[in-house]
């Protein structure tokens, strides 16, 4: 009795590989502002110099307020080397269309906010006054 070996199809040996495509930018460049946190004992900063470097290398513009990273032991030189623009005027930072903060917006910041501005930060509704929320809604803050 002759026994024959089963044949194994070679199609099981191939794996599908992902193809990496060159993604072209859509032309929309973001201008992101990082203000210095003023809350009591707030030492965090929203973006590290490494994160700023990634944003800048992807064609975006990042502005950071002077000494914003000192509580997290990042110097202005660290951010400048990563490609950020150091801004010495708090009012100028708040003119950026996108703000990134590690602490919530406080009442003192509301007059500085611009129309249709995007703010990426925590928000504590229980700590906000209804008038503050109304001002943010009037300015169409997202």
Locations of regions flagged by a protein language model:
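Structural/interface elements that position substrates and couple domains in central-metabolism enzymes
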Residues: 2-134, 138
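Glycine-rich loop-to-alpha-helix module at the N-terminal edge of alpha/beta enzyme cores
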Residues: 142
């Amino acid at each position: 009795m002759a026994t024959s070996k089963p044949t194994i199809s070679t199609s099981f040996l191939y794996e599908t590989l992902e193809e990496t495509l060159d993604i072209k930018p859509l032309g929309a460049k973001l201008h992101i502002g990082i203000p210095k946190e003023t809350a009591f004992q707030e030492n965090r900063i929203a973006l590290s110099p490494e994160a700023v470097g990634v944003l800048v290398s992807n064609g975006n513009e990042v502005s950071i307020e002077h000494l914003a990273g000192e509580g997290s032991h990042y110097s202005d030189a660290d951010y400048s080397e990563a490609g950020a623009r150091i801004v010495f005027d708090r009012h100028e930072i708040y003119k950026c269309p996108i703000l990134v903060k590690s602490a919530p917006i406080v009442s003192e910041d509301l007059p500085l906010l611009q129309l249709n501005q995007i703010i990426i930060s925590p928000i504590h509704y229980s700590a906000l006054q209804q008038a503050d929320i109304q001002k943010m809604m009037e300015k169409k803050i997202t």
